[in-house]
Amino acid sequence: MTVQAIAGVSPSSEAVVMTEYPSIAAGGIAQLLGSIYESIPSPAGLPKLSYLFALATAPFGILLYALQKLFGQRYVLTNRAIQGWTARTSRMVSSLNLSDFDRVEVVQSAGQVFYNAADLRFVGANGETLLRLKGVKDAGAFRNAIERTAESRRMVQESLATISARG
């Protein structure tokens, strides 16, 4: 059994905090469908007619979902980085350390509104985009998890530096 000075903190290993699979709103075809769904007006007091149109195009949505699961990505938040992995294989396609970005922005295009999804844009200190996670379902919650994990990482690093400075 390993004793940790700070519960849940391991200075030598990386641990998964959260895994997020993007919605079909990550792709252009689904965003086009989402834009069409949102453009259908809803009569006052009645359910949105766009739900009926979405039901009619459901087989196409299922195909897009299957393709996303086969050939898309998954986003993994660890105690050290945010990573993009291929959905089926264990191949990392992108990574950004939690200390390397300045802020995380939620960018929602018109086609993503119907799916309650958005892109997460990681911005560096100089304003450049360091990483973009496309089509994240409930992006605000995932952004909060990333920001809290990054803040925790920073505080842990400060604590470990203070402890090691004591000698």
Predicted regions and their residues:
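N-terminal basic, Ser/Thr-rich segments that initiate or prime the first beta/alpha elements at protein or domain
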Residues: M1-G167
